Amino acid sequence: MRTLWIMAVLLLGVEGSVIELGKMIFQETGKNPATSYGLYGCNCGPGGRRKPKDATDRCCYVHKCCYKKLTDCDPIKDRYSYSWVNKAIVCGEDNPCLKEMCECDKAVAICFRENLDTYDKKKKINLKLFCKKTSEQC
């Protein structure tokens, strides 16, 4: 159980409601979110935004940009709720910021599914020090 929690915390850099985000990713891709995406490429997991290695890595880049736009809620601490209806994620928050955070997580989960063909197991655990800085803005 402790190992599961540690892996969940690695998932996309401790941001967001980690449990909900992990469930979304699993529901959309069928992959273990922590081991498949927790340290993928240059943008998944802890650290700043870098030049994406592929479309899957770009999903994480865009996710970090989405979180950067949030106001009035804390993606690290705050939690939201969502439901899985007819194989679709439905964000169910009344709080506008929590709803937006849920939408950010929904978008990255769908992005991962849509880019499963670019997923490269060799990039699953990437040393971030070999990642290039990017001048691209969110």
From Swiss-Prot:
Disulfide bonds join 42-131, 44-60, 59-111, 65-138, 66-104, 73-97, 91-102. The record marks 127, 130 as: Hydrophobic membrane-disruption site (MDiS). It is found in: Secreted. It comes from the Eukaryota. The record marks 128, 133 as: Cationic membrane-docking site (MDoS). Its main location: secreted. This is Basic phospholipase A2 homolog Ts-K49a. It comes from Trimeresurus stejnegeri.
